[in-house]
């Protein structure tokens, strides 16, 4: 038996004891046992000043579990169980930059300073595991003031349950679902200016909370996506009509946030590749109503035009392209960037290691998974097993799977 004192070294800079994770969970062990290189999925990626240990990221997952926009222990445990198992980056759910920008009354927010502190707890947990963490900043637009989806997928949160059906906003006064959702108020130019200021203020609060990365949500039919799409944006001023006008708010917001956060902090912008009306059956009611011409809805071609504009403003782009088999849209957008170093990811339906690796080998930089992490918090370990790759596990987990080795030692 050794006479040396063997210390269970603490993670640096954490307010409570937690063992140091060096390297972090999810780090690939290279080379593989057979001598071959490890899959690209488990190679590091650097964006600006942040290095991610692998390329499988946790997508934002709304939990509808906050009160007055304040995160709580549910958010800590939901994210913590995944974070300790090693995604390259974990992204906190859509977080409203204005109170009326929540999807439901139970969404997380960052529209006031008091909301920083509970998010700090989550950030500290991630950093205690040597993991990277991001936050997605969002405004739900005309899809706001709903109830939690397990209660009803198409119900409005009324004033009696904390909703704001009289204060729903959008580019134009067009409801999400006619006869179901409230008819929104078209934002004035002055309100658009305030929105940009509030978005920047929320980003600055995210920096104070300690996040490593910020993501701007411009997908899924929420406010910034609504400005992009002619289906929801029928304005006649500088924020509607032409492609240049419809993309103006997203580009101005991206530029303003980029200028307000540290230079070495990565900024992601999540977009939907398409409204999908362009792929509806020729002659169908959807095609006739929403996509009679190539410019009648948001399309893959327009996403291709947008991506270089985002890159020029210092952003990377996760592309919501549908199930994994449709992720070639992300590849198309990546190719449109030419020599740009902008990182592009595929989002959605990526549920096995072979597909994830195939997408990366085709030129994408990152794959993102959401619900699969919900079902299996150890998804990173599962994908590593599928690809016959060893990855570092959190010390508290890995020692039970053959990770009994010589500990870090410190002489007293």
What are these regions (language model features)?
Residues 1-412:
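Flavin-dependent oxidoreductase catalytic cores
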């Amino acid at each position: 038996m050794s006479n040396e004192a063997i210390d269970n070294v603490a993670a640096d800079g954490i307010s409570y004891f937690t063992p140091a994770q060096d390297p972090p969970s999810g780090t690939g062990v290279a080379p593989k046992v057979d001598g071959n290189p490890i899959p690209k999925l488990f190679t590091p990626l650097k964006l600006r000043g942040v290095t991610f240990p692998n390329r499988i990221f946790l997508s934002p997952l709304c939990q509808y579990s906050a009160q007055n926009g304040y995160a709580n222990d549910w958010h800590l445990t939901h994210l913590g169980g995944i974070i300790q198992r090693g995604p390259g980056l974990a992204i906190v759910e859509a977080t409203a930059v204005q109170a009326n920008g929540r999807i439901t009354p139970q969404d997380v927010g960052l529209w006031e300073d008091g909301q920083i502190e509970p998010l700090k707890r989550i950030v500290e947990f991630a950093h205690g595991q040597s993991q990277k963490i991001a936050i997605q900043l969002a405004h739900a637009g005309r899809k706001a003031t709903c109830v939690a989806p397990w209660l009803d997928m198409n119900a409005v949160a009324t004033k009696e349950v904390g909703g704001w059906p009289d204060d729903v906003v959008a580019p134009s006064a067009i409801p999400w679902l006619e006869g179901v959702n409230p008819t929104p108020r078209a934002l004035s130019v002055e309100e658009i200016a305030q929105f940009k200021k509030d978005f920047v203020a929320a980003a600055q609060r995210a920096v104070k909370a300690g996040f490593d990365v910020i993501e701007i949500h411009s997908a899924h039919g929420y406010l910034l996506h609504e400005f992009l799409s002619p289906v929801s944006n029928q304005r006649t001023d500088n924020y509607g009509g032409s492609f240049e006008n419809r993309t103006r708010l997203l580009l101005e917001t991206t530029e303003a946030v980029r200028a307000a956060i540290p230079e070495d902090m990565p900024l992601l912008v999540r977009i939907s590749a398409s409204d999908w009306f362009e792929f509806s059956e020729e002659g169908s009611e959807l095609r006739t109503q929403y996509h009679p011409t190539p410019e009648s809805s948001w399309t893959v071609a327009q996403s291709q035009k947008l991506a270089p504009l985002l890159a020029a403003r210092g952003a990377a782009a996760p592309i919501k392209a549908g199930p994994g088999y449709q992720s070639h849209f992300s590849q198309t957008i990546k190719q449109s960037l030419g020599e740009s170093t902008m990182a592009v990811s595929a989002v959605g339906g990526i549920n096995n290691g072979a597909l994830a690796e195939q997408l990366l080998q085709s030129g994408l930089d990152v794959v993102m998974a959401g619900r699969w992490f919900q079902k299996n918090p150890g998804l990173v370990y599962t994908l590593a097993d599928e690809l016959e790759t060893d990855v570092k596990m959190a010390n508290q987990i890995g020692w039970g799977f053959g990770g009994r080795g010589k500990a870090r030692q410190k002489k007293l």
